[in-house]
Design a protein with these regions (language model features):
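Compositionally biased linear targeting/interaction segments
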Residues: 1-306
């Protein structure tokens, strides 16, 4: 009996010790993960400041925005140490060692390369010109016209509600207004939500968006125009109109532009087993305003930003 009691006591002590060790290990793991997350957020804040600087300096260099501009070049995943090594500031060997384990990637997207859903209303009325543009996009993508009608009706109702109905702030929230997840996924590459009326930048728009925003422009002609544009971006609306043939007669501001002021910045930091992604929308003005910002923490491998 005494032997059994002793064995049970030893087993209990071993169990308690193992439990304590496990809890300590988990605590260290949580602490390490939180530390990595905070470090990643700090790096992403620096990356966002850098992106705002790039956009500000770019605005000073000309009156057009196109896909050959420096901001349009994605940053493929690279070690942080590759940036520190080229810095003129003194960087310690210890810092470089840590930076070897940190990977950065990111890109800046022109949101005015897309149709702005906010444009569907003007005041508290539907905008006929913009509804027609979205109708062409819906038809091109094989989406029902009825879905667009519901979307416009809901937007008009929200604009007339005196604040009783909340307007979306993200494209992902357009399901509030009647779009199904499948319809939204189909539209997502071609639309945006910006809290002001915006024109489409003809220099950065895809063939699908050009077809939608320029009445009478066939998709095949839009595709040819994009190929020509890649060799020589359009400096003025007049140049763009000439390249779009007969349909170019419909090109005019402010619905069409060759420059942009609204951009999305996507940054990603991979640090150990922690990956943090941040998306921000910047309004390029005197203050480089951040319209909104969201972050997500992922575990394990992630897909490329491209």
């Amino acid at each position: 009996m005494a032997l059994i009691t002793a064995m049970l006591t030893v087993a209990l002590i071993a169990t308690l010790a193992a439990t304590a060790l496990w809890q300590q290990w988990r605590s260290l793991q949580v602490e390490s993960a939180e530390r990595q997350r905070q470090q990643a957020l700090w790096l992403l804040s620096g990356a966002l400041d850098w992106a705002r600087l790039v956009l500000r300096e770019d605005a000073r260099s000309g009156n057009t925005d196109h896909l050959a501009k420096p901001w349009a070049l994605p940053l493929q995943e690279a070690r942080l140490s590759s940036f520190l090594a080229s810095s003129s500031d003194g960087v310690s060997e210890e810092d470089l060692g840590v930076a070897e384990r940190v990977f950065l990637s990111g890109q800046i997207r022109d949101l005015q390369a897309r149709l702005n859903v906010f444009n569907l209303i003007q005041g508290d009325q539907a905008s006929a010109v913009d509804v027609a543009a979205f109708d062409r996009l819906f038809e091109l993508l094989g989406l029902p016209h009825e879905a667009l009608e519901v979307l416009v009706r809901q937007l008009v109702a929200a604009s007339r509600s005196g604040g009783r109905f909340v307007m979306p702030q993200r494209v992902s929230q357009l399901t509030w207004l009647g779009l199904s997840p499948a319809q939204l996924a189909r539209l997502d590459p071609f639309i945006t939500w910006l809290p002001m009326r915006t024109g489409v930048n003809l220099n950065t728009a895809t063939p699908e968006v050009l077809h939608a925003c320029v009445p009478g422009l066939r998709l095949a002609d839009a595709q040819r125009a994009v190929l020509q544009r890649s060799a020589q971006p359009w400096r003025t609306l007049e140049e763009a109109a000439q390249q779009l043939g007969d349909a170019g007669k419909a090109v005019s501001g402010p619905g069409h532009q060759v420059a942009s002021n609204s951009f999305e910045v996507i940054g990603r930091v991979r640090l150990g087993s922690t990956t943090v992604t941040e998306r921000s929308v910047i309004q390029r003005d005197d203050n480089q305003r951040i319209l909104w910002r969201e972050r997500g923490v992922l575990a394990g491998p992630v897909r490329s930003l491209q």
